[in-house]
Amino acid sequence: MPHKIGFVVVSSSGHEDGFSARELMIHAPTVSGWRSPKFCQFPQEIVLQMVERCRIRKLQLLAHQYMISSKVEFYISESLPEYLVPYQAERFRRLGYVSLCDNEKTGCKARELKSVYVDAVGQFLKLIFHQTTNKYNVNQVALVAINIIGDPADLGDESNTTCREKLIDHYLGHSPHNPEDPALDGTFAGRSDYISPLDDLAFDMYQDPEVAQIIRRLDERKREAAKKERYDHAKKLKQAIADLQKVGERLGRYEVEKRRAVEKEDYDLAKEKKQQMARYRAQVYEQLELHGLLQGEPEMQRPFALPLQPLASPSSPQHWKAVSSLPRTEELAAEDTCAGPILQEKPLASSPRHSAVDRSPPAAGPAPRSHVEALPYDERPLPVTRKQLEEPSAEPEVREADSDVRRRGVSAEPEPLTEKALREASSAIDTLGEALVAGAYSKMWSCREDALLALYKRLMEMPVGTQKEDLKNMLRASVFLIRRAIKDIVTSVFQASLKLLKMIITQYIPKHKLGKLDTTYCVERAIPLLLARTGDSSARLRVMALNFIQEMALFKEVRSLQLIPSYLVQPLKTNASVHLAMSQVDLLARLLRDLGTEGSGFTVDNVMKFAVSALEHRVYEVRETAVRIILDMYRQHPALTLEHLPPDDSTTRRNLLYKAIFEGFAKIDGRPTEAEGKTQKRVVTKEAEKQKKEETKALQGLSAAPRETQAGVQEKENEAVKLKNQDPQGRKAAPPDTPEIPDNHYLDNLCIFCGERNESFTEEGLDLHYWKHCLMLTRCDHCRQVVEISSLTEHLLTECDKRDGFGKCPRCSEAVPKEELPRHIKTKECNPAKSEKVANRCPLCHENFAPGEEAWKVHLMGSAGCTMNLRKTHILCKAPAPQQGKGPMASKSGTSAPKVGSKIPTPKGGLSKSSSRTHTRR
């Protein structure tokens, strides 16, 4: 029968420090596997030597989440090739290859488990890895684990076994293809090609190594019991194996979380996880002993420790020796008829956090072993490696061991109370009876749930005329059991406790007219435990606790007491879990909106003290919610809120949280924010500069008007005389105001960006034009550099001195400050950009328009174009459209206004000469 084959790593083409190929010899939740060197040459290869010559049936590869080889080739050989052993020239024989998923659909957050079915005989296996490319990795490949499943290549024994099985089937009249007796089903473990789920790679990679060895031993005992026809005991062992698989998964997650905490140097959390594992392991082993499932196991200490040894090297004398099995004892004489779950989980003091896993192991099935007295080589316990998973894959949350669906077999009575339980619950026993309390203390969750439902029914049926003392005793006993059930990790038990607590507060107390002291007693005894459950690792339990606390705070019986707000405004503890801190601040924000600050227990003082302290929390979500709380308080009490905050100055605004808070205040008040204020200030400054420049030019024009007028009159008289003498009809006269510009002087007095030509455009004049007036240019508000508007976005992202403070929005493709980028992307209010071939994108008005260079001029300079180009209005008012593209006379026409206002009269000849020039041009 195929089973797991042990192997050692003979050679590899290289590895990164801390990720040797020898890591592949270990299967455990915390292994890191092999990684090729960085910037390595491809292909990379690994050679494995199996413990014996065998027939390989199945190969399993667990790939890395992003260091993924595009193709893995497999080669097999009976002995080492020539380049490894010089005196043997045999080469590897190629089996084929497999392609691995590029993992883009999951965002490189999951690992692929690839299974390959082969049929090849040999002792050496070579794997060749080819290069891959994704956005996270371009020069490295990795393999987390590899599993080889096969059987010894002794064909004679195999054929004999097959013939013997066929002979037995023949005499029994049983065909494996059409079985009649399920006990003799050939598709079950008796098949020669059957592969046990316990040999699957997924089983070892997500199971605690100690628990995995216990599961394998229980599986052997289960098959032994089935052979002896002790079916009740086999059924009990099967249920224990199923429960232990969930226990092993949880312990494996705890181990990964502990290693991750050590990696982050969070030693308090690591110590907490270690203690949590020890308590949980001791609890599980105690239940196994209680049910007689650890009989035959070696003596254990708490926590249980199995000898975990690494695989021996091929040269070691112990390499080919089998590991002796643990001593076995007789099975239990009495058979248990209970078919319910064997292991019942108890609440722990500290809740575990969610762990990321890649795949849940399959349900354990029977896996027969040919050896009873000795474990084969490949079943040797594997050690827990000291390497930490540096890139744990993000996978969906693992479900808790208990399900909401009842797994009831034959109804079972709760076990008797222990001495400790009798002392602890003595008052509740006196009031409710030992049977009900025993059910609430039972190790079977169905009994615990039934006890709470029975108590619910009893309280509902209490008659109205009952004495007050009896009613109060019943209430206190019920609260005692509710407190215990609130800490239960089983969802249905937790729900039953919430249902019972709600009924007591809203129905039982009002019905029997008990006082506020009794309501206060219920709330004060339950609320601390409920708040603790809001930090639970299970998202479902966490949400249930949050919603119930919010609902309970709104009960009219509880709201008047103002108790719950006093718990929520307590400062966050520095060592509190992330979920607990997030839940507390979220619950405070919810209730603050529902209850307000008038007679609710919330005051401006206690809420603001809590929110300001939460601004310093290490978790971003907590700080973000604290900002939202402060803004909500400012809407209701602006003056009192400001008293708890530092002054609004440049020093305070260096903190991005306070900057966001004060800008939020400005929006609430309708005032411009800091950015809007700077923009308005720049606009006012530009308008003032524009007005000052116009006044200066007007004064210069007035002072130059007499000289220009006199020179113009003389020039026009000379031209009139010349035209009269040469050609009275004016056909050969060339117009003096449109001189032809030579090619070598075409760029003189011309702005190459907007196309305007002006005599004032000397070297200094052009600089002034670029700096203040050109419609195609703008000044960067961050580095004061003059850039083209069409390239402003690229400038902010790549050239600007403040480019590190900007990021590119994937939706609109514009540069956005990094502190505003998450909100900008989340709101999706920006206008989506189109490709450059389809449209241009204006960074001023954020609109898309026609593509091409000329379209930029139309958009930025046209009257119907960009509405956010602040230079447009000034330039258009100063220089009308016909002025662009003309010769030097265009600049003269611009100074005609001062001439009209001059005291020197305009000569009459000027008008006739102008008309004659017009006629000549025609």
From Swiss-Prot:
GO terms for cellular component: centriole; centrosome; cilium; cytoplasm; spindle pole. GO terms for molecular function: glutamate binding; glycine binding; thienylcyclohexylpiperidine binding. Required for ciliogenesis and for structural integrity at the ciliary tip. The gene is Cep104. Residues 210-277, 678-705 form a coiled coil. It is found in: Cell projection, Cilium; Cytoplasm, Cytoskeleton, Microtubule organizing center, Centrosome, Centriole; Cytoplasm, Cytoskeleton, Microtubule organizing center, Centrosome; Cytoplasm, Cytoskeleton, Spindle pole. The keyword Coiled coil applies. Residues 396-407, 673-697, 714-725 have a biased composition (Basic and acidic residues). Residues 307-333, 348-419, 673-741, 880-922 are annotated as: Disordered. HEAT repeats lie at residues 526-564, 601-637. Pfam families: CEP104-like_TOG, CEP104_N, CEP104_ZnF. InterPro entries: ARM-like, ARM-type_fold, CEP104-like, CEP104_N, CEP104_Znf, Galactose-bd-like_sf, TOG, Znf_RING/FYVE/PHD. Its main location: other. This is Centrosomal protein of 104 kDa. It comes from Rattus norvegicus (Rat). Residues 307-318 have a biased composition (Low complexity). Expressed predominantly in the brain. Also detected, although at much lower levels, in the heart and the liver. Within the brain, expressed in the cerebral cortex, hippocampus, cerebellum and brainstem. Interacts with CCP110 and CEP97. Interacts with ARMC9, TOGARAM1, CCDC66 and CSPP1. Transmembrane segments: none annotated. Keywords: Cell projection, Coiled coil, Cytoplasm, Cytoskeleton, Repeat.
